[in-house]
Curated annotation (Swiss-Prot):
GO terms for cellular component: cytoplasm; small ribosomal subunit. GO terms for biological process: translation. It comes from Thermosipho melanesiensis (strain DSM 12029 / CIP 104789 / BI429). Part of the 30S ribosomal subunit. Contacts proteins S3 and S10. Belongs to the universal ribosomal protein uS14 family. Zinc-binding uS14 subfamily. Keywords: Metal-binding, Ribonucleoprotein, Ribosomal protein, RNA-binding, rRNA-binding, Zinc. This is Small ribosomal subunit protein uS14. Transmembrane segments: none annotated. It comes from the Bacteria. Binds 16S rRNA, required for the assembly of 30S particles and may also be responsible for determining the conformation of the 16S rRNA at the A site. The gene is rpsZ. Zn(2+) binds at residues 24, 27, 40, 43. Binds 1 zinc ion per subunit. The keyword Translocase does not apply. Its cofactor is Zn(2+).
Amino acid sequence: MARKGLVERWKKPKKFKTREYTRCKICGRTHSVYREFGVCRVCFRKMANEGKLPGVRKATW
């Protein structure tokens, strides 16, 4: 319940630019969010394994 309230509050426009912070567009997680994709590492890995991110493939060496 608390996370849902934070996500709703996060969507509102901020009074000052410095108060904005990155959140995952899917789950609302605040830590380890990739700016390029706008999702957190957990959602990124899940989407990459499902093939939903074009051009992203698992590294092998």
